[in-house]
Amino acid sequence: MSANPFTLSFGKKPLQYISRLTETNQILESFCAEIPSNQIYMITGVRGSGKTVMMTNIASELRKREDWIVVELNPTRDLLQSLAAKIYSIPELHTLFINAKLDFSAFGLGVSIENAAPVTDIENALELMLKYIQKSEKRLLISVDEVTNSEYIRIFASSFQIFLRNDYPIF
């Protein structure tokens, strides 16, 4: 009996991978363009069709580039809080935030900074973080797998729309 060329581990690339090269390249080209035509893609399909694998491959490709920051969020948790925590934990950005005397201690991120007013709204905190990502000429890819219609997703989508309107490099 021969081994099954497919995998039941969601998101893990199977031995027999059905490449979505055209679609993957279209998304990568769009995201990497000087002026992106799209900053959001929703990958849909039937169960087992390779949505998570495709998303993982796109994230992997962008992670290899120095001008990209890639974070993965869990849709069952507070996405804005998780995003702030993940951005804050990136050593290069963490140092930028401390040097800029940004106090995110109200969210359990880092330490209180003397003579700095604490940021008390998570959306404002993320906007400050995104400004520093923009100043450092980087782009931020956020991937969320298995999205459902939940309050966390609706809040995140509303904030994401605001970030897009403010021209932050968020994808």
Spans of features found by a protein language model:
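Well-ordered alpha-helical segments embedded in enzymatic catalytic cores
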Residues: 23-29, 124-128, 155
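Amphipathic alpha-helical segments in well-structured domains
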Residues: 24, 55, 80, 156-157
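P-loop NTPase nucleotide-binding core
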Residues: 36-151, 168-169
